[in-house]
Amino acid sequence: MDINASLIVQMLVFVVFIGLTMKFIWPPLTKALEARRKNIADGLAAAEEGRKELELAEIKSKEQLTEAKTQAAHIIEQANQRANHIVEEAKNKAREEGAHLIQLAKNEIEQEYNAAKTELLKQISTIAVAGAQKILQREVDKASNDRLVDELVSEI
């Protein structure tokens, strides 16, 4: 094998090229690769953190939804109890008012009954006095007595 000067020059140029490449090109290239690796790692870490936050947010939202449903059920139960209480109060008030009105009606009926009874007694007294006057004005015999009683009965 013949080593000539051109092969040595080519080897020297290659070594110089490798040296220059290692000094000027390789460091920025490794920095760019390292920055890219770091950027990808940061992106993956951020994605993992985002996934964890999403899971926490889902858990929290489920808890809040469960709590909201519980509160809604409690509010509905309270509203139903209040409505039932109001209905019962209204029923009791209506019963009391009905009993009061019935008592007032009974009192009014009793007053009307007593007034009618008093009026009837006045009329009977008037008729009895009128009948007694007629009897005293006439001579009393059996036939006239019967006729007078019939007249009084027809007037009553």
UniProtKB/Swiss-Prot annotation:
Looking up Pfam families in the UniProt record yields:
ATP-synt_B
GO cellular component terms listed in the entry, alphabetical order: plasma membrane; proton-transporting ATP synthase complex
UniProtKB keywords: ATP synthesis, Cell inner membrane, Cell membrane, CF(0), Hydrogen ion transport, Ion transport, Membrane, Transmembrane, Transmembrane helix, Transport
Q: Name one GO molecular function term.
A: proton-transporting ATP synthase activity, rotational mechanism
Cited InterPro entries: ATP_synth_B-like_membr_sf, ATP_synth_b/b'su_bac/chlpt, ATP_synth_F0_bsu_bac, ATP_synthase_B_chain
- Membrane-spanning ranges: 7-27
The record describes its membrane topology as: Single-pass membrane protein
Entry-linked SUPFAM superfamilies: F1F0 ATP synthase subunit B, membrane domain (SSF81573)
Localization of this protein:
Cell inner membrane
- Reading the lineage from the top rank, the first entry is Bacteria
Just give the chief location class.
membrane
NCBIfam families per the record? ATP_synt_b, PRK05759.1-2
Annotated function:
F(1)F(0) ATP synthase produces ATP from ADP in the presence of a proton or sodium gradient. F-type ATPases consist of two structural domains, F(1) containing the extramembraneous catalytic core and F(0) containing the membrane proton channel, linked together by a central stalk and a peripheral stalk. During catalysis, ATP synthesis in the catalytic domain of F(1) is coupled via a rotary mechanism of the central stalk subunits to proton translocation. Component of the F(0) channel, it forms part of the peripheral stalk, linking F(1) to F(0).
Subunit info here reads:
F-type ATPases have 2 components, F(1) - the catalytic core - and F(0) - the membrane proton channel. F(1) has five subunits: alpha(3), beta(3), gamma(1), delta(1), epsilon(1). F(0) has three main subunits: a(1), b(2) and c(10-14). The alpha and beta chains form an alternating ring which encloses part of the gamma chain. F(1) is attached to F(0) by a central stalk formed by the gamma and epsilon chains, while a peripheral stalk is formed by the delta and b chains.
The family annotation for this protein states: Belongs to the ATPase B chain family.
What HAMAP family does the record tag this protein with? ATP_synth_b_bprime (MF_01398)
PANTHER family assigned: ATP SYNTHASE SUBUNIT B, ATP SYNTHASE SUBUNIT B', CHLOROPLASTIC
Name recorded for this polypeptide: ATP synthase subunit b
Say which species the protein is native to: Coxiella burnetii (strain Dugway 5J108-111)
The record lists the lineage as: Bacteria, Pseudomonadati, Pseudomonadota, Gammaproteobacteria, Legionellales
Name of the coding gene: atpF
